[in-house]
Curated annotation (Swiss-Prot):
Catalytic activity: ATP-dependent breakage, passage and rejoining of double-stranded DNA
GO MF term (any one): DNA binding
Keyword match DNA-binding: yes
Residues reported in the UniProt entry to bind ATP: N46, D78, T99, K100, G109, Q110, Q111, G112, I113, G114, I115, S116, K471
Protein name: Type 2 DNA topoisomerase 6 subunit B
Enzyme Commission code: 5.6.2.2
Lineage of producing organism: Archaea, Methanobacteriati, Methanobacteriota, Thermococci, Thermococcales
Annotated organism of origin: Pyrococcus abyssi (strain GE5 / Orsay)
Job description of the protein: Relaxes both positive and negative superturns and exhibits a strong decatenase activity.
Family: Belongs to the TOP6B family.
Membrane-crossing residue ranges in chain numbering: none
HAMAP family in alphabetical order: Top6B (MF_00322)
InterPro entries from the UniProt entry: HATPase_C_sf, Ribosomal_Su5_D2-typ_SF, Ribsml_uS5_D2-typ_fold_subgr, TopoVI_B, TopoVI_B_transducer
Matching Gene3D superfamilies: 1.10.8.50, 3.30.230.10, Histidine kinase-like ATPase, C-terminal domain (3.30.565.10)
Subunit-structure text: Homodimer. Heterotetramer of two Top6A and two Top6B chains.
Length: 564
């Protein structure tokens, strides 16, 4: 029988980088087409975020050069603010590091894995370092970066510096990757950039394909989105560990000041109410009579905390004083049990909904501009819903765009999270289920699958509830599902109104053309019967038709459809 010490001889600590090196599929690196798209996604989202935060209209150029079979060089260049030299190894070589992961703020990337994951994938498939060229306006830094997967650290294997007489600013990265494939499919790079251009009409995006063809998605809006605002956590959306960890990191003088300063919707008055709720919970738990305990808890749930306290006579005042002392001590001395009591009380208390001023949707006008510029439809509409919350305190917002007809050939669902296209795992996404739940026939769309209709849905949040670290599918949460449905129905009503008018116009055109078709024969017959000139008879009937069947101006397409 083996001894415990022998069993643990192979025990080793694994770094984050080592874990994701072995489980690259969790980051979206699965399949030859998807892996290449994921690399582009990580680089482009970084570029867009950086440009917007710096107040720069994005110019992004993507080049894909074929070096051999399933072997490519990927180049992504932007005109962003650049990266300070000392941060290069951290940005490109350290997992779970970044400017967004630790902040309660809306952004395209959230986990601090993205671009370093792309660098690692390039490294493990080609063995080559990633070349980074960047400048913040001063000298140009050229660095070759690799990841030390054992230490989860970036390592610059070579570095050069160049003068910058023209004052160029931006970042260019070059990755060499193998076991990937470029195709113009709906899960490929071209489609990803096309969808990115629709949701980001302020960005100019260029793609040089492996065959040398240049594809340009021009900017259709000069408005730079306002940068999102960091938001404080809401009491209804935190766990015990959140409160405990935040308290021990806080520099505030007391737990009271910590709660008021670092959470939204908590004032001094609310802290006084919190003290009452914690006191009431302690007293209820000390009650031995089960029936009495249940009745008191029901009262507390209904919000009648004062009535609960009075039920314990003089006892409650002493307990209240003990709880009040918790609020006066240093937050770094808050115990786990006290943090549990705070969160338990939060769940029973009533708070205003969290502020939503930090959310930055695309906006109805920009959605229409993006859809019109890229898809060339005959009809377009957009709806941006008012912000809501899920999970008690996490703000989110839903917006929808519909594009119909024109150059659109068939139906398509364009899924986005914080303006980022979601190309994979559509079946498990709340957006897909919400779109499929709509009875499109009510809105004059006989068959959604064959209709020339594009549905765009963008979910905006400081914390998008993705189903996995691959960030390609949004969890089916009731509040989000319902908001998407409401937005879709609003937009679909507008489409229905447009189609109703279009069908009426087409019907009138068809009636008129049918009557005009038989007019020569009618005129000829009446000429024989009455002796009146044919032209005079035709002129009379033409005026009669025009007076009885008024036809609004129709497009050439509508006229052709009416004839058909």
């Amino acid at each position: 029988m083996a001894e415990a010490r022998d069993l643990f001889k192979e025990f080793k600590v694994q770094s984050v980088s080592e874990f994701f090196r072995r489980n690259a599929a969790m980051l979206g690196y699965t399949g030859k087409i998807r892996s290449l798209t994921t690399i582009i996604h990580e680089a482009v989202t970084n570029s867009l975020d950086a440009c917007e935060e710096a107040g720069i209209l994005p110019y992004i150029r993507v080049e894909i050069e074929e070096l051999g079979k399933e072997h490519y060089k990927v180049i992504v260049e932007d005109n962003g603010p650049g990266i300070p030299e000392e941060y290069i190894p951290h940005v490109f070589g350290k997992m779970l590091a970044g400017t967004k992961a630790h902040r309660n703020i809306q952004s395209r990337g959230q986990q601090g894995i993205g671009i370093s994951g792309a660098v690692m994938f390039a490294q493990i498939t080609s063995g080559k370092a990633t070349r980074v060229i960047t400048s913040t306006g001063g000298e140009i830094v050229e660095a070759w970066v690799k990841i030390d997967v054992q230490k989860n650290e970036g390592k610059i294997v070579k570095k050069l510096k160049h003068p910058n007489p023209k004052g160029w600013r931006g970042t260019r990265i070059e990755l060499e990757v193998k076991d990937v494939k470029y195709v113009r499919s709906k899960q490929g790079v071209y489609w990803y950039l096309k969808l990115t251009a629709i949701a980001n009409p302020h960005a100019h995006i260029e793609l040089v394909e492996p065959d040398g063809k240049l594809v340009v998605f021009p900017r259709s809006s000069e408005d730079i989105p306002e940068p999102p605002v960091e938001m404080k956590p809401h009491p209804k959306g935190v766990m015990v560990d959140d409160v405990y960890t935040m308290a021990h990191r806080s520099k505030r003088s007391s737990v009271r000041r910590f709660l008021v300063s670092e959470f939204s919707r908590i004032s001094d008055k609310k802290v006084d109410e919190l003290i009452k709720y914690i006191t009431a919970l302690r007293l209820i738990k000390s009650e031995t009579n089960k029936e009495v305990k249940e009745k008191l808890y029901e009262k507390l749930v209904s919000g009648d905390v004062d009535s609960v306290l009075r039920a314990f006579g003089r006892k409650w005042k002493k307990e209240l004083e003990k709880v009040a002392k918790i609020m006066d001590k240093s937050p770094e001395k808050l115990t786990w049990h006290e943090a549990e009591e705070i969160v338990e009380a939060f769940k029973l208390m009533k708070f205003l909904a969290p502020p939503t001023h930090g959310l930055r949707p695309i906006g109805e006008e920009n959605i229409k501009k993006g859809l019109t510029s890229i898809l060339k439809p005959e009809f377009v509409t957009a709806v941006t819903r008012a912000p809501r919350v899920y999970a008690g305190g996490i703000p989110f917002q839903v917006e929808v765009g519909l594009a119909y007809g024109g150059q659109i050939q068939g139906s398509e669902i364009l899924r986005y999270a914080n303006r980022v296209p979601l190309l994979f795992d559509a079946g498990s996404c709340v957006i897909t289920s919400a779109v499929r739940s709509i009875d499109w026939k009510r809105y004059k769309i006989d068959s959604f699958d064959s209709a020339p209709l594009v549905v765009l849905v963008n979910v905006v949040s400081v914390h998008v509830p993705y189903t996995s670290t691959g960030k390609q599918s949004i969890a089916d949460i009731d509040e989000i599902h319902n908001e998407i449905r409401l937005a879709l129905m609003d937009a679909a009503r507008r489409l229905s109104f447009y189609l109703g008018g279009k069908f009426r116009r087409m019907y009138q055109v068809k009636r008129r053309k049918t009557l005009e078709k038989y007019l020569p024969e009618i005129a000829r017959s009446l000429h024989i019967l009455t002796g009146e000139p044919e032209e005079k008879i035709k002129e009379y009937f033409l005026k009669l038709i025009e007076s009885k069947i008024e036809v609004e101006e129709v497009s050439e397409v509508e006229a052709e459809e009416a004839e058909a």
